[in-house]
Amino acid sequence: MQITTRAYQPEDFAACARIEAGAVRANHYFADVVDYYRSTAGELTVACVDGVPVGMGKLTVLFDGSTWLELLRVHPDFQRKGVGRAIYRRYFEEIRALGCPAARMYTGVSNKASAGLAEQFGLKRRAQFHSMCIPTENLRCRTDIKPLPRIGAEQALAFLPQLNKQTGGFLCINHTFYHLSETTLRGFAAMGWLWGDEDTLLIAGARFQPQKALYLTMADSGENQKEKLSRALNHAAALAALSGAEQLVIHFDPNDSKIHDFCLENGFVDDPVDDVVMEWAEESADTNR
């Protein structure tokens, strides 16, 4: 059995769709994102056994030059046979070629197989996140609350202490966990994902599938915190209504009871499984197999 890896080609579409259907029971989104993935920096990789596609994975270069490892899928007939390792080797060949200082991925807190594969290549557990969601139809947009203006990175930087405490150093959009930094906030500003004023910050956006969900982070400063968070949530509800997003999704540190309680009071529902972000960084990497 010969395992090889190469860049995705348009003629691989049907095979990759079958790989996704076999590898995961739900949340099939390859068809929606393949064109987007091919337009972003970083390779969409196909793994083949004896020339036949049986796995795939995407490496994406983010705003700060780090890489995000996503869409790792292996057909069940070929799992635990070295296909995932081959995709990771391809990832790290590209990481070295691009000179990227860090690589990250996420998995479910109980997904030992995914975490174990990442650990073989030097990724280490970095942070854990709890998520909650609410259908847009359950949101209420109040007309008596003043909307938030769009802001730039400079204004958002004032909220760094609160964001670090709330997010563990990462901002989540479409289950992509961006390292919290000035460079990342400038990238978010360029995407139009930042809203706020001197007391309230809302980060809201979607990398892809904007009709599926709008991903948000909320932060506040000073007194009347619940009032400020309510203003941010109201603005997010309006954005979701305008974009046609089916739901709002929020990720935060599992120990942040303030955000958790606020979301519960406003109709959000807990997701059953927390997410774990894993990271490889140049200065701490032990193996690049």
Provide a role label for each language-model segment.
Residues 46, 52-60, 68, 73, ...:
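Conserved beta-strand in the GNAT
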Residues 94-110, 242-253:
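Conserved GNAT acetyl-CoA-binding A-motif
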Residues 61-69, 79, 206-218, 270-274:
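A conserved beta-turn-beta hairpin within the catalytic core of GNAT-like acetyltransferases
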Residues 13, 20-58, 165-194:
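Active-site rim helix/loop that mediates acceptor-substrate recognition in acyltransferases
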Residues 85, 109-127, 254-271:
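Conserved active-site alpha-helix within GNAT-family acetyltransferase domains
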Residues 74, 80-94, 116, 120, ...:
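Conserved acetyl-CoA-binding loop-helix of GNAT-fold acetyltransferases
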Residues 121-211:
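Amide-forming acyltransferase catalytic core, primarily the GNAT-like/NAT-type
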Residues 61, 104-107, 124-138, 269-281:
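Conserved catalytic-core motifs of GNAT/GCN5-like acyltransferases
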